[in-house]
Amino acid sequence: MRKIVTIDGPSGVGKGTVAQALARRHGWAYLDSGAVYRLAALFLKRQNLSLAATATQVAALQEMAVDFVMTETVVRVFLNGVAIDDVLRREETGALASQLAVKPEIRAALLDFQRNFAGDAPLIADGRDMGTVVFPEAPLKIFLDATAEIRAERRYKQLIEKGEDVTLAALKKEIAARDARDRNRLVAPLKPASDAVLIDTTDLSVQAVLEKIDALWQAHFFNF
């Protein structure tokens, strides 16, 4: 069985920060599912295609190539060989990705891409349905959560540090809307896998979350 750890949760809960730290610490491959959907949205836009789920869009996505290159401090993301970090994390890109993710045909087109990512290499995968849909066989599944207010505040700090012009009120509204879309969509709604370990990060630092996961890691993979 392939070594896989899935980390799911809502927007702004710290999935990426935690998953990247674990991937660096253990030398595993890293898959950012949220980035895949963001990249798909950007790819379609750059092909002058709408976000509709037609055969044209599904076929176009077969030509999308994604690479995550991990350095000591950041993860560089490449779309068909071109660095895309500058627009990938913008709020408008996230909103487009969330719209795309509710379309069953698009999700199906990207499912095999994610399952085959990095071949048989050990993998850390973060997203919203990694443990429930993409890697239901993963030996260790984690679901991170936090209050919407805390998640908005964390995201606000990140974006301000990057020099983006955002308001906390707007972020709270966007996160509430995204939560509703993600939790209520008919296909792969945001929810913990039945065997996932739930961790509330509202009052926890990143280091505290990593310590909890490391204890679980030892229990699951020490004799794997």
Curated annotation (Swiss-Prot):
**What keywords were assigned to this record?**
ATP-binding, Cytoplasm, Kinase, Nucleotide-binding, Transferase
Q: Which InterPro entries match?
A: Cytidylate_kin, Cytidylate_kinase_dom, P-loop_NTPase
- Biological-process GO terms, alphabetical: pyrimidine nucleotide metabolic process
One Gene Ontology cellular component: cytoplasm
Q: What is the lineage of its organism?
A: Bacteria, Pseudomonadati, Pseudomonadota, Gammaproteobacteria, Cardiobacteriales
The record ties this protein, via SUPFAM superfamilies, to: P-loop containing nucleoside triphosphate hydrolases (SSF52540)
Please name the source species: Dichelobacter nodosus (strain VCS1703A)
Which coarse location class describes where this protein primarily resides?
cytoplasm
Q: Where in the cell is it found?
A: Cytoplasm
Record's keyword annotation contains Nucleotide-binding: yes
Cite the EC number. Answer: 2.7.4.25
Query: Pfam families recorded for this chain?
Result: Cytidylate_kin
Recorded catalytic reaction(s): these are:
CMP + ATP = CDP + ADP; dCMP + ATP = dCDP + ADP
Under Gene Ontology molecular function, one entry of this record is: dCMP kinase activity
NCBIfam families, sorted = cmk
Protein known as? Cytidylate kinase
Q: Which residues form a coiled coil?
A: none
Q: What gene does this protein come from?
A: cmk
